[in-house]
Amino acid sequence: MSTPTQLSYKDAGVDIDAGNALVDNIKSAVKRTHRPEVMGNLGGFGALCELPTKYKHPVLVSGTDGVGTKLRLAIDYQKHDSVGVDLVAMCVNDLIVAGAEPLFFLDYYATGKLDVATATSVVNGIAEGCAQSGCALIGGETAEMPGMYEGEDYDLAGFCVGVVEKEDVLDGSKVVAGDALIALGSSGPHSNGYSLIRKVLEVSKADPQQDLEGKPLIDHLLEPTKIYVKPLLKLLEKHDIHAMAHITGGGFWENIPRVLPNDAKAVVKGDSWQWPTVFNWLMENGNIAEFEMYRTFNCGVGMIIALPQDQVDAALTLLKAEGENAWLIGDIASRNGDEEQVEIC
């Protein structure tokens, strides 16, 4: 009688040794993101973090997000570190809108077969995003799931927790008619609208490696999402900020109203900035209407800030000193009846 074949987890497609190799590869990158509030090291069942002692009435602010179908382009063109930055940016930029300082970040990486080099590149990008935002990469999960993903495909999710003083929470309630609106420039499409971007590439039959303003089109499309946390924390220390809107999926039409009272509308001056070339390329090659562009993409504006008119000059000076491309983009007006809450003129 033959002896039954002994099966292992590796025979089923899950390589524990590869997972351990990944952990070893990322330890130094994770260490760079350490904050003094973090207790313990990688490898525990739960990650521990104290609240910073400077807060008297701390409020925790949480956020979760992904990178969407930008991942498809990243996988196809083997550019994995940038999507790690994207993952962090999409979460921490949402937290800063509430006035919150990001404390810690966790990631979820899922794939059918773990490629240690690819995963290392992704997590190194995540660590870079955490370093840019002053946030500790406190833990994560790597899920190798045979039969769930094709080939080299993988998916990402990020989770972030920040803290803000209770009396300093930004919720849009302070916004009033007459407030000024400052814009912060984006680095490109960030992490939104990529299903449409991929459709434009398909329909136009454009070569993603073609030159656009001195570098390949694909490099414009995979440019990491800009992280605004550190300059905005400095701005919040110095100025009476009434609201901030992170321009993500839904563009101008969907995101700005999220931080406006019902009786207020944002009047945006469309001639106050020039769209980065990549957006003009998408609009032309996809035959996309202007309304749809503003509904899908950030069109060069990653963040909008509402504040009193008399603080505009000082705020712009601070933001530019921090390296931001910042400008006056419009103001807040009273809204009558069923008027739209965003007007681009």
UniProtKB/Swiss-Prot annotation:
UniProt xrefs under InterPro entries: PurM-like_C_dom, PurM-like_C_sf, PurM-like_N, PurM-like_N_sf, PurM_cligase
UniProt entry tagged with the keyword Nucleotide-binding: yes
PANTHER family in UniProt: TRIFUNCTIONAL PURINE BIOSYNTHETIC PROTEIN ADENOSINE-3, TRIFUNCTIONAL PURINE BIOSYNTHETIC PROTEIN ADENOSINE-3-RELATED
Protein name: Phosphoribosylformylglycinamidine cyclo-ligase
The family this protein is said to belong to: Belongs to the AIR synthase family.
Compartment(s) of residence: Cytoplasm
Protein's organism: Shewanella loihica (strain ATCC BAA-1088 / PV-4)
Pfam families linked to this entry: AIRS (PF00586), AIRS_C (PF02769)
